[in-house]
Amino acid sequence: MTLQTPREDVAAERAGRAGLITLDRPAVLNALTLPMIRQIRGALERHLADPAVEVIVIRSASAKAFCAGGDMRRIRELSLHGEFDAIAAFFTDEYALNLAISECAKPYVALIDGVAMGGGLGLSVHGRHRVVTEHAMLAMPETAIGFIPDVGASYFLSRIDPAIGMWLALTGARVGGAEAVASRLATQLTPSDRLPGLLAELSDVSAGSIEAVLQRFAEPVDLAPLQAALRKRAAGFDASSLADVLAAWRAAAGDAALAAFSPAALASSFELLRAAHGKPLRECLAIEFELSMAFARHPDFIEGARAVLVDKDRKPHWQS
């Protein structure tokens, strides 16, 4: 009889000079659990301590998704059972990981091939090198489940074009690989069929030549038209009041579009991004933690997560 051992959702190994962290929970698009977050943090620390590792690479075992974000369905279950200490542990460790990635002393490369949402951006955008492919799709969709853009999103979305950052935060709009480069969420576009070659070269380089290797595998991106198109889609989202932002959004998309988003989450997300200007990531994460704990108890989160993640009828009945 073969004994079955628990399957690891995160694999850590060294390939030459590259310390690899591989997400492998494909059935749920690598949605992050607390054990996964702790496994990633442990792998990161081991690679940092290993003198043979020159570069740290995080990737997915599946081409379908890099990481679909935190397991918010599980957070909803914990909330319904009043297990707020467990929720606090999840967000505490997740945000600590985001900060650790931002402070990583070795080059950190995220290979984003497929979906990257919410917590998936927390694993990638804070790193030095964010490589997207033509299959990449990035988004911060939290307001549709009655939550706020977290994992340091208030930090990185407040540091790109103001209208585009607010548009991404409030609407959960999805951007492709080239658009992610144009909006500065990603640092380069690399065709998916070139990722194996890129990884092979990263495993055989010194820290000083990593940038050159990455650029050799990068595809040129014509930024100007993409940035113009993004600004057009985000028109009006740089207004100084939420009422004006919502008016611009309503004029472009109609009342029905706004009904899909929690009014409380939209209001808090708007203020969160405006307050984040000039603040360091650590402070932004601390503010997000307080809001995340508040929204974990909010009826709009319970209802929004039900409508999007549980019943999937996408017909939320907001209480705010």
Residues covered by each model-derived region:
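Conserved CoA-thioester-binding segment of acyl-CoA-metabolizing enzymes
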Residues: M1-R59, L99
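Long, low-complexity C-terminal extensions of enzymes
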Residues: A248-A253, L258-S320
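Gly/Pro- and small hydrophobic-enriched strand-loop and loop-to-helix capping segments
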Residues: R128-P149, R184-L199
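Glycine- (often His-adjacent) and acidic-residue-rich active-site loop
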Residues: S60-D93, A144-G146
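Glycine-rich beta-to-alpha active-site loop
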Residues: I101-I145, W167-L168, G172-G177
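Hydrophobic, secondary-structure "cap" segments at the distal end of domains
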Residues: S154-A163
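Amphipathic alpha-helical blocks and their helix-capping loop/short-beta junctions
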Residues: A182-F261
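Hydrophobic/aromatic residues within transmembrane alpha-helices
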Residues: I58, D71, L123-S124, E179-A180, ...
